[in-house]
Amino acid sequence: MENQAHIAGEKKGIMEKIKEKLPGGHGDHKETAGTHGHPGTATHGAPATGGAYGQQGHAGTTGTGLHGAHAGEKKGVMENIKDKLPGGHQDHQQTGGTYGQQGHTGTATHGTPATGGTYGQQGHTGTATHGTPATGGTYGEQGHTGVTGTGTHGTGEKKGVMENIKEKLPGGHGDHQQTGGTYGQQGHTGTATHGTPAGGGTYEQHGHTGMTGTGTHGTGEKKGVMENIKDKLPGGHGDHQQTGGTYGQQGHTGTATQGTPAGGGTYEQHGHTGMTGAGTHSTGEKKGVMENIKEKLPGGHSDHQQTGGAYGQQGHTGTATHGTPAGGGTYGQHGHAGVIGTETHGTTATGGTHGQHGHTGTTGTGTHGSDGIGEKKSLMDKIKDKLPGQH
């Protein structure tokens, strides 16, 4: 189903464009229906294999994209959230989960194998672009979301509050690999771009978020308060590696760009945040209060290494720039914060293990050409925008 909005100025409803552009591939496709009422959709020579043994509501979409969608469409709140997720044009492969999955959605573009989880997963979503294998978790995962390598370039649309929060999370341009967690994860989100393996946690992770290599390029959009908080977190353009924590993590966030392995903690981590290599390029946007708080944290250009503590750390912070290894403490540390190396290249940010709480690892975020371009900033805009700026 190809929906290419070539005619500008179309007035559309709220729910009309949420799913109308998901499948839009152009090539040879192979569709293999699953067993036990399993729908599978594949484009571009991509084998979409449905799950087996009692799966329900499994949706497999491969090779969807927006082609020549002219700006100027009047859209609602929820219209642009998912309309730009996949846009690849190559061979894809998607394999559905097995054994009792529910609500599984796998979207893969550009030769990307998106493999669904196995054994009782619910609400699993895997999206991968540009040769990226997105592998879902196994054994009872719930709410797993994998978004890889989607982005918008020069859109210029006037959008609402929630429209731009997730539409630009992935914007990488390379081979990616995303591996979901295993054994009872909930709310797991893994995003990887540019050949970046984003490994999800295992054994009962909750709220795991992995964002890698997303960015906006010359958008020029007028955005609200919450629109730019997350749209510029990842913006790297290289090979990345992200490894999620294992064994009962909650609220784990790992973001890695430019060959930077950001290793999440293991064994019951909470609120772990790892951000690597996010940046904006010549945006020139009018921003609100909270938009610029995190967009300029790191801006350096060297190799860095950060190693989180192990065994029950809380609030771990380690700051290291220019090849400096900042080793976190072990066994029950509190209030430790780790910001490493702005615009990192080959930087290794390793999260703590065994019961860490509130671990924050930020590696390699930076802005390029966003200074002195007429941005209107508020009270909290410049609090952290100049922390790391080594070049």
From Swiss-Prot:
Sequence repeats lie at residues 9-31, 49-62, 72-94, 95-108, 115-128, 135-148, 156-178, 179-192, 199-212, 220-242, 243-256, 263-276, 284-306, 307-320, 327-340, 350-363, 374-391. Residues 34-59, 93-145, 177-196, 241-260, 272-282, 305-324, 333-351 have a biased composition (Low complexity). One of its GO terms (biological process) is response to water deprivation. Residues 21-33, 70-92, 155-176, 219-240, 283-304, 373-391 have a biased composition (Basic and acidic residues). Residues 21-391 are annotated as: Disordered. Residues 49-363 are annotated as: 11 X 14 AA approximate repeats. The keyword Repeat applies. InterPro entries: Dehydrin, Dehydrin_CS. It comes from the Eukaryota. Residues 9-391 are annotated as: 6 X 23 AA approximate repeats. Induction: Specifically induced by cold temperatures. Contains 6 A-type repeats and 11 B-type repeats similar to those found in maize, rice and barley dehydrin and rab proteins. PANTHER family: DEHYDRIN XERO 1 (PTHR33346:SF42), DEHYDRIN XERO 2-RELATED (PTHR33346). Belongs to the plant dehydrin family. May reduce intracellular freezing damage during winter by hydrogen-bonding to the lattice of the nascent ice crystals, thus modifying the structure and/or propagation of ice crystals. This is Cold-shock protein CS120. The lineage of its organism: Eukaryota, Viridiplantae, Streptophyta, Embryophyta, Tracheophyta.
